[in-house]
């Protein structure tokens, strides 16, 4: 199946937009081309190309290829952000549970206390990062190999550090219904 020009898709668990889409029933892979964006709950994923692998009627995993970015909105000012060359997002029962970020990894995120109070702002970089999700939010991250970064108190965050260079928030184009 092929769809062209201003493709929009909606399911309760995932939404997406792109210019064109190809679905291959042999390997149950849906490939999104040209400015693809995928949303799962509060997570936005984007890259140059997104491949979504299905298992029956649910998403098994997604491969975000080149200039990969995931963004989670905390509030209207604060966003958790991770970018890299590529990402692999793994789903269980329609919920994203694990993201593997590979190559030139940059992060900008707000660690939280148990009561959701933001404790500061953490900027890190490395080569491979594993993110783990719980209750539809980022729970923890683990860099593989060397990483470096800086933790800023909330009142001392440099304005130029608030957004990664590739930051984009496209909630205004997100399909909200069928």
What spans do the regions from the language model cover?
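Mature-chain termini and adjacent capping regions
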Residues: 1-178
């Amino acid at each position: 199946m092929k769809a062209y020009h201003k493709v929009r898709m909606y399911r309760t668990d995932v939404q997406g937009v792109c210019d064109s889409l190809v679905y291959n029933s042999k390997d149950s892979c849906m490939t999104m081309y040209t400015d693809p964006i995928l949303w799962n709950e509060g997570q936005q994923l984007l890259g140059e190309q997104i491949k979504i692998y299905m298992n029956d009627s649910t998403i098994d995993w997604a491969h975000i290829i080149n200039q990969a970015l995931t963004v989670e909105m905390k509030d209207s000012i604060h966003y958790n952000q991770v970018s890299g060359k590529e990402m692999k997002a793994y789903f269980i029962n329609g919920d994203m549970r694990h993201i593997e970020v590979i190559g030139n990894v940059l992060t900008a995120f707000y660690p939280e206390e148990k009561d959701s109070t933001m404790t500061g702002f953490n900027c890190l970089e490395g080569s491979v990062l594993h993110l783990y999700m719980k209750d539809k939010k980022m729970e923890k991250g683990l860099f593989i190999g060397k990483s470096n970064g800086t933790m800023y108190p909330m009142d001392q965050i440099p304005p130029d550090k608030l957004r990664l260079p590739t930051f984009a928030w496209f909630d205004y184009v997100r399909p909200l219904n069928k």
